[in-house]
Design a protein with these regions (language model features):
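Negatively charged, low-complexity tracts enriched in Asp/Glu with abundant Ser/Thr
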Residues: 1-33, 37
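Mixed-charge, Lys/Arg-enriched low-complexity segments
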Residues: 4-9, 65-91
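Generic low-complexity, intrinsically disordered sequence content enriched
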Residues: 8, 12, 16, 36, ...
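Acidic, low-complexity, intrinsically disordered interaction modules
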Residues: 22-80
């Protein structure tokens, strides 16, 4: 995992200071976008072992290449993460 990927992944889990943390990576050569926010049906094991099949996915890409996908069961939280990802590298 690159430094940028690590920063992005940590930032999506921690809303504080996200823009400042990512600012040094945001220049004309790096384009960060959350390309999709969608409801998906997938077997997903929670940390407590419960299985759920209706979850939400945010796919974050950099320069058109998928870097990581984040899954969650709470629509509001995932929408916030989607909006955050869209906002992170905007000037």
């Amino acid at each position: 995992m690159t430094d940028l990927e690590r920063v992005l992944k940590n930032s999506l889990h921690n809303f504080k200071n996200t823009k400042e943390t990512c600012k040094k990576f945001c220049n004309n050569t790096i384009v960060l976008t959350a390309t999709t926010f969608e409801r998906v049906f997938k077997n997903y094991s929670e940390s407590n072992g419960n299985m759920i099949d209706k979850i939400y996915r945010v796919i974050v890409t950099i320069d058109g290449q998928t870097r990581f996908e984040h899954y969650g069961k709470d629509a509001n939280e995932m929408n916030n993460q989607y909006l955050l990802a869209l906002d992170m590298c905007q000037n």
